[in-house]
Regions:
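Sec-dependent signal peptide recognition
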Residues: 1-7
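C-terminal motif of bacterial Sec signal peptides marking the signal peptidase cleavage site
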Residues: 12-13
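A short beta-strand-turn-helix
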Residues: 18-37
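Short pre-active-site segment immediately N-terminal to redox-active cysteine/selenocysteine motifs
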Residues: 35-37, 41-45, 112
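Conserved redox-active cysteine motifs that mediate thiol-disulfide chemistry
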Residues: 41-58
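Thiol-based oxidoreductase modules, predominantly thioredoxin-like and allied folds used
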Residues: 65-80, 92-101
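Short, internal strand/loop/helix patches
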Residues: 84-119
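Thiol-/selenol-based redox modules, centered on thioredoxin-like
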Residues: 118-144
Length: 144
């Protein structure tokens, strides 16, 4: 009985992730407190999305900045394995959500890609529906 009680206490004390990435790892919102999150909705059939990848890879290296992707076709249940394959194909260095972002933030399905949401402390600060340049990304980081 004592073993079961200890096991139960251990299981209840383990922190569960609030969302998952396509690599199987999880995270909590607290992990990104005071960081600027660029949530980039992309697709492999979108040339401007592919052009943005190196820019997002670069800005993701900045302190207090996190880039998180979500493939547009995941709204229709594109498997994580396929998303990971595409991310490798395009040399994407940032993480990609497995959890539908509409369940994490008050987002609507974007009308177009690329769409990038700028989020800080759970609040959506801006929605950008055009391709971003390195200069614009740096400007957005500086202003947020």
């Amino acid at each position: 009985m004592k073993k079961y009680l200890i096991l139960a206490l251990f299981l209840f004390s383990c922190e569960r992730p609030e969302f998952l990435f396509t690599d199987g790892k999880g995270a909590k919102f607290a992990d990104y407190e005071d960081q600027i999150i660029f949530l980039n909705i992309w697709a492999d059939w979108c040339p401007p999305c592919i052009i943005e990848f190196p820019y997002f890879n670069e800005i993701n290296e900045e302190p207090n900045v996190t880039v998180i992707g979500f493939h547009f076709d995941q709204f229709d249940i594109l498997p994580n394995e396929e998303v990971n394959r595409l991310m490798n194909k395009f040399n994407v260095d940032f993480k990609n959500l497995s959890t539908d972002p509409r369940n994490l933030w008050s987002l609507d399905l974007p009308d177009s890609v690329p769409t990038t949401y700028i989020i800080k402390n759970g609040e959506i600060l801006d929605t950008i529906t055009y391709p971003l340049t390195p200069e614009k990304l740096r400007e957005l980081v500086a202003s947020n």
